[in-house]
Structure formats: C-alpha cells, structure tokens
C-alpha cells in the first residue's frame, strides 16, 4: 500500500515514500541526461536554481547577475536567499541545483568547490575602547560588547568558534535577522562592535570607514564556495554560476 487514506490529507506510506523518491531520482536522471547531451553539443541551456546565504547575497548577486544574463541567455536563473541548513535540505531534496555558501558548513553528501577567501574585519563603535586601535587581536574583544547574527546563520557559528566561546557567549544583543547591515547600525548607536566579511566593506559609507579595524592573522576569514549535491551532473551550469 503506497497511500495512507486514513489520514487527512492523504499521505504516502513508508513504502510509498520509497517509490516517490525512486520516481524523483528517475526524473532527475532523465533531465540530467537531456541537459548533458545539450552540453556536449556546445549549448549551455536549462534552468539553474541557485541558493545564496544572507551574508553573501547583498554583496555579490548584483555583480554576478547582469553578466550571467548577458553571457547565458538560454539559462533560466532562479535565486533564493536562505540560511545554510535550508540550503543543505534544498540541495538534498532537489529544490535547488547549487548554492553559494561558506566552505565547510554543509556537511556530508554535499560537494564544495572553493572560490575565494573573504577576510573578517571588526566594525567598532567610536564609544568602544578598541576604536583607537587599527589592528585587533580576537582575544582582546570583550564578548559582552560583541553583537552577532541570529542562530541559523553560519557566519554566527564561525564567529563564535573564532572567539572560542561556543554557546555560552554572552552578548547584549541578538537578532532574529540575517542582516549584517542591521548589526552595523546597532554598533553606530551603541558602544558595541561586530565582525563583518570583506565583501561588505565597500558598501560602508566613507564617513564610517574609520570604524573598520583589521583582525590579527589567524583564523580570521571564511572561504566562499559553490556547493552541489554529490549526484549533480550539470557541471557546465555549476561552472558558470561561479562569480568572477
């Protein structure tokens, strides 16, 4: 029995779920073969569903999309902004084809191709004692003054690990938002500081650039990568999704 009709709405039984997954795999295989044949003919076409984490999307997509649309007019590009856990689930369930993520955050079953390093900077309030410094060591940061992203954002996890404070890290502020811009606005009106990626630096107004401080050498960067599920074969579409 493939359907459980005793439930409202009707749902698939355990056996039914297996059959449905096999059917999905067959359809994916058919689509992949068809598109691979087109690639062998030298034609890059089809649909590319791309997921992007919130700490990349605002700073990279507007540079990437115009050239992509111009260079690959036969590719239908669909972009979704989502946190890493949702990206992993979407990749495994074939809801997206690829994603731009921080390397090392997707876990088993996902392949990553690293693209570039993205350094971290401190963004420090003029009211904070570290404001007068041009270079800051991580151990000098008072964790009570550090504002970070809400749970679900992989950059939050990276910052917590960087500060070696894990789940117990105290903070005056925590936001249910993936917005680095919000964190910087909070820093502007408090005595706090936050940590931002290099790709966000060019969008900071010139009158606030003095709040940017370099971090001492060490684990003070992330690697940006393209991620796909292991069974994905549309390699030419993945190649063209790499920002230049």
Q: What is the role of each PLM region?
A:
Residues 19-41:
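Alpha-helical linker/hinge and terminal dimerization helices associated
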Residues 75, 85, 89-93, 107-189, ...:
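C-terminal regulatory
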Residues 45-108, 176-177:
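Central regulatory/effector-binding core of bacterial HTH transcription factors
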Residues 97-101, 192-197:
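Paired acidic/hydrophobic, glycine-rich loop segments that form the ligand-binding mouth/hinge
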Residues 1-14:
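A short LG(V/I)-centered, amphipathic sequence patch enriched
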Residues 123-127, 223-234:
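A bilobed periplasmic-binding-protein/Venus flytrap-type ligand-binding module shared by bacterial periplasmic
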Residues 41-48, 142-143:
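Immediate post-signal peptide segment of exported/extracytoplasmic ligand-binding proteins
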């Amino acid at each position: 029995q493939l359907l459980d009709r005793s439930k409202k709405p009707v749902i698939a039984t355990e056996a039914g779920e297996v059959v449905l997954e096999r059917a999905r795999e067959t359809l994916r295989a058919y689509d992949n073969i068809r598109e691979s044949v087109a690639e062998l003919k030298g034609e890059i076409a089809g649909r590319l569903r791309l997921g992007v984490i919130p700490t990349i999307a605002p700073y990279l997509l507007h540079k990437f999309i115009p050239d992509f649309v111009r260079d690959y007019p036969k590719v239908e590009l669909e972009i979704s902004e989502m946190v890493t856990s949702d990206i992993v689930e979407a990749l495994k369930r074939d809801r997206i084809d690829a994603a731009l993520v921080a390397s090392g955050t997707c876990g088993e079953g996902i392949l990553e191709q690293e693209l570039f390093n993205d350094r971290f900077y401190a963004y420090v309030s003029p009211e904070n004692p570290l404001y007068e410094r041009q270079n800051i060591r991580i151990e000098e940061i008072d964790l009570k003054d550090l504002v970070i992203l809400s749970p679900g954002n992989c950059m939050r996890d990276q910052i917590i690990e960087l500060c070696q404070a894990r789940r117990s890290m105290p903070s005056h502020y925590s936001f249910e938002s993936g917005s680095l811009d919000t964190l910087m606005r909070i820093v502007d009106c408090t005595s706090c500081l936050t940590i931002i990626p290099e790709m966000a630096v060019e969008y900071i107004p010139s009158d606030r650039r003095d709040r940017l401080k370099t971090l001492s050498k060490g684990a003070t960067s992330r690697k940006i990568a393209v991620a796909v599920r292991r069974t994905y074969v549309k390699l030419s579409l993945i190649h063209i999704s790499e920002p230049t």
